[in-house]
Amino acid sequence: MTKFKFLTSVAFAATLMLGAAGFSTAASADDKITIIVGGYEKLIYLPAKLAERLGYYKEQGLDVELINEAAGVDAEDEMLAGNVQGVVGFYDHNIDLQSKGKFTVDVVQFLQAPGEVEMVSTKHPEIKGAADFKGHDLGVTGLGSSTNFLTQYLAVKNGVELGTFTSVAVGAGDTFIAAMEQDKIQAGMTTEPTITRLVKKGLATPLIDMRTVAATRAALGGTYPASSLYMTQEYINGHKETVQKLVNAYVKTMKYIHDHSAEEIAAQMPKDYMVGDPEGYVKALAAGKEMYTPDGLMPEDGPKTVLAVLSTFSKSVKGKTIDLSKTYTTEFVKAAK
């Protein structure tokens, strides 16, 4: 049993005992929500923590607990097991899961570009593009993660067969930087603020940049909606009012990001997220503001692009009939107050 599952079991048992003793709480059970975030210090997942810092969850009468999890694939496993109610992770997981007969739905879209960059070690100038991935170890947050999906796509698109390079799970932040420094990986996909830290240390330079919509279209052939809040269809069906409250909070957060400067947004965030470099954090946020959706809506051409990308290399998705309309909904965003 994992530490998380053990704590969840203890918490559940405690809840049962309190209920039996006749205790009550101010918030209803439906308004207590646990969400796993695939690394909430990352700028790509900033809206989840920003909503908390701005008081938008409480404003909706919600008691939201955010749990940090480095890799999205582990987060979705916890949700499917019923241990948490939602995941803040990449939209592409909904397509991947449907191909395996599991139905989850993106209810609000945070990013319209991945915010990811393939970084190449300064020790390996021979890697000039994805066509040079062959024979190298490439860093990803986790095997089965969105960074691994994108890495595999870029390789296959550029004529490099799966199996001729190795994806290495190195997480993000300090662990990613250490792997690059120790030459355990020669290139790897990561986000801010890790990108800025690598460049400042002279360890790596950007190879393929997907922090803007235009750059993403050039790399992937279309808009690639990335981080979002997704939940199981079963949970959504049974808790529509709670889901609407959550989406209300996130739509308000997206509008805050759109209407405020990087300095103003950074001032709301925990100082430790800036790993001792607040100036670099603000600079990275300013450069990446375009990746955030202004209103939480799914870009119209996004799902088709993601399906095309996954169909290129994924044995789970390739050849399967995927109903994209069941992988996301705009119902709650359009009704947001």
Segment roles from a protein language model:
Residues 1-12:
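Bacterial N-terminal signal peptides that target proteins for export
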Residues 29-170, 179-192, 203, 207-208, ...:
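Short, glycine-/small- and polar/acidic-enriched structural segments
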Residues 51, 91, 149, 229-230, ...:
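A generic alpha-helix surface/boundary motif
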Residues 304-337:
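Conserved C-terminal helix/tail region of periplasmic/extracytoplasmic solute-binding proteins
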Residues 175-178, 182-270:
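Pocket-lining segment of extracytoplasmic ligand-binding domains
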Residues 59, 131, 211-222, 290-299:
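Short, solvent-exposed loop/beta-turn-alpha elements that line the ligand-binding surface or hinge
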